[in-house]
Regions:
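Structural motif
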Residues: 108-110, 131
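C-terminal motif of bacterial Sec signal peptides marking the signal peptidase cleavage site
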Residues: 7-10
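Extracytoplasmic/secreted envelope proteins and their assembly/folding machinery
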Residues: 42-46, 50, 70-74, 105, ...
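Aromatic- and glycine-rich peptidoglycan recognition patches
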Residues: 12-26, 32-37, 99-100, 117, ...
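Post-signal-peptide N-terminal segment of Sec-exported extracytoplasmic proteins
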Residues: 20, 25-65
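Sec-dependent signal peptide recognition
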Residues: 1-2
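Catalytic cysteine-centered active-site loop
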Residues: 32-33, 55-107
């Protein structure tokens, strides 16, 4: 009887890094992010990121009514890692990170792009896994994109591990 209760109880939640995680929450996050979330993934990041999918873009915005790219990175970092980032993508690139190559990106690293003036950082997202990152697109709101898409591949500046 004790084994049966343990088995049933273990079907609903898991303890990772000192947190109880509901598998239904992870399943919903995986559906919204459109990829599998594995045992070794950064669950708090994946869950928080998934809650922002579909939020409209708003320049200078930092809430669920509208958010821009640096507002998204700043808000998710504050929520998940209790870390404050600067308010714009260029400042985040210059002051908040240690540069990381595309090949060495890990979940939670920031990814920087030049979408305007050539070579100048003007867009930022958060790397999730397997080439996927979350960001606030000015035309589509908060979405997950792939670093291997031509636009992002051609405009990628650097990754960054937050200091």
């Amino acid at each position: 009887m004790g084994f049966l209760l343990l088995t049933i109880a273990s079907c609903g939640t898991s303890k990772k890094a000192g947190r109880n995680v509901d598998y239904h929450v992870l399943a919903r996050a995986a559906i919204k992010l459109d990829f599998d979330i594995d045992e070794d993934d950064d669950w708090p990041l994946m869950i928080e990121a998934s809650t922002w999918i579909g939020t409209p873009y708003k320049y200078g915005g930092e809430d669920r009514f509208g958010i821009d790219c640096s507002g998204l990175t700043r808000t998710i970092y504050r929520q998940v890692y209790k870390t404050e980032l600067h308010r714009n993508s260029f400042e985040q690139y210059k002051k908040d990170v240690k540069k990381v190559s595309k090949n060495n990106l890990m979940s939670g690293d920031l990814v920087f792009f030049s979408t305007g003036e050539k070579g100048k950082v003007s867009h930022v997202g958060i790397y999730l896994k397997d080439g996927k990152f979350i960001h606030a697109s000015s035309s589509r709101g908060v979405i997950v994109s792939d670093l291997n898409q031509n636009f992002y591949k051609n405009n990628f500046i650097s990754g960054g591990k937050v200091k």
